[in-house]
Amino acid sequence: MKQKEFTTRMYSEAIRERMQELNMSKADLIRTAEISRDTLNRALEGKSVQMATIVAICDALGVGRDESNDFWETDYYDPKFDRP
């Protein structure tokens, strides 16, 4: 039996809401989080991203430890959806 693989995803609505609250553009978030546009787009599409990306985006958005679970989840890896 093949073991299931897991991945981490971000909640795009939560990211967009926080960006709006902070009056932050995508370019601002990319610059502050020090990530690429492709990486941000993956996060906003709900595709798998690395934990370092989640930390960078949450830090850039000022997400506190107590609310970080509202921004990301661990889920089953789906090769059809998660491949770059």
Pin down the residues of each PLM region.
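The DNA-recognition helices of helix-turn-helix-type DNA-binding domains
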Residues: S36, K47, D75
